[in-house]
Amino acid sequence: MDTVFALGSAQGRAGVSVIRLSGPAAWAVAETICGSLPDPRKSAVRVLRAQDGSVIDQALVLAFKAPHSFTGEDVVEFHVHGSIAVVRTVLDALSDQDVARLAEAGEFTRRALENGKLDLSQVEGLADLIDAETEAQRRQAVRVLTGALGEKVEVWRSKLIRAAALIEATIDFADEDVPVDVTPEVTSLLEDVSSDVRTEVAGTHVAERIRSGFEIALVGAPNAGKSTLLNKLAGRDAAITSEIAGTTRDVIEVRMDLGGLPVTFLDTAGLRQSADEIETIGIERAIKRAQEADLRVFLSGPDERLLIEPLEDDIRLTPKVDLAPGSQTGISGKTGQGIPELLEKIRSVFSERVSAVGLATHERHRLAMQRALEDLDNSFEALLRGPEFYDITAQELRSAIRALETLVGRIDAENLLDEIFSSFCLGK
């Protein structure tokens, strides 16, 4: 295994930058520029020197001995002053060592996976934590990073292995008198796992939305005040406003952190019958995007006909209430009236949905669990048909186990790993 190094903190000027080495020669390489290393898992200040003996910087140095490190290998970290010049010079000094090379994107984390320090779901949790912008995203990523999904998968896997073992034992002793009927226990195990997996699958949509952001479509007729409201919510001129109906033709998006929840407001084209071909295309897009959104806010009077059928949680508000003297209900993008109440209602709706979120956070997780459910359904069907179909039951159970194992990376999937790690920076 090569020894690799990279900048482990953000690129650019900073108070402190972290440079990480990992691999069998990490300690030897580090000693060439800092002299003696501190004891494992302890820190010490060292002077870093180039090959010609010139001083590069003073650094805080930490050393970790395998397997007690992030990667499971020997690791050394240099915490240097965050000057671009200092970082570049340290990296150049490390490059001068023939036994070390610059790490590829995500290579440190990949080594942690290969050495059993993380499972695949934890790797994805780490990536999500790095990308987290809101509190809900951070909490969700931490749950996965700390191994909660992997622990749940292991419980499912253990139960299915027990069920498969019972079936296999019955097959092996088919010609002998087996005193115990395994069907009740196997049935109970399959029902337990199937129920848990279905619950987890049901929560994946919300989990994926926490990662990408809940979408809220502003829907209404032309000149209903949608763009003005969007600009008020954004605190800037995100959309063009005009007294001319049909100004908005493309869907305009504004992302926000709403009480820790990631949301995206969509300003859609005004809905009406139009002879303008370009506007008609915009209206068709608006209807499609609004129907796909997680929530719709209809800006329309109580007697107006809606071109999109509202769903249970959708919100309907009278727009431009600033033009109706004495009105206490509705909303105004111009004055801000009704906006706090709207945001609280939206936050309440999504908070209730988030309460049902599971641990599976990626589409890959959902697809793997759906495959496992199909295999479990097939195995249960074969089980009920009697002992002569136990070989099919065992085969389907093994398929279900393999599907669940892909969640945590027990099954080799080189292309999948390449895709996941390509999203990491060099220092991870």
Swiss-Prot record:
What SUPFAM superfamilies does this protein map onto? Folate-binding domain, P-loop containing nucleoside triphosphate hydrolases, TrmE connector domain
Q: Which residues form the TrmE-type G domain?
A: 213-351
User: Where does the record say this protein resides?
Assistant: Cytoplasm
Tell me which residues bind (6S)-5-formyl-5,6,7,8-tetrahydrofolate: 20, 77, 117, 428
Can the keyword Thylakoid be found in this entry's annotation?
no
Binding locations of Mg(2+): 227, 248
| Record has Cell wall biogenesis/degradation as a keyword | no
* GO cellular component annotations of the record: cytoplasm
Q: Cite the binding residues for GTP.
A: 223-228, 242-248, 267-270
Q: Where is K(+) annotated to bind?
A: 223, 242, 244, 247
Q: Which GO terms describe its molecular function?
A: GTP binding; GTPase activity; metal ion binding
Q: How is the cofactor bound?
A: Binds 1 potassium ion per subunit.
Quote the InterPro entries the UniProt record gives. Answer: G_TrmE, GTP-bd, GTP-bd_TrmE_N, GTPase_MnmE, MnmE_dom2, MnmE_helical, P-loop_NTPase, Small_GTP-bd
What does this protein do, in the record's words? Exhibits a very high intrinsic GTPase hydrolysis rate. Involved in the addition of a carboxymethylaminomethyl (cmnm) group at the wobble position (U34) of certain tRNAs, forming tRNA-cmnm(5)s(2)U34.
Task: Tell me how this protein assembles.
Answer: Homodimer. Heterotetramer of two MnmE and two MnmG subunits.
Name-wise, this protein is tRNA modification GTPase MnmE
Q: Gene name?
A: mnmE
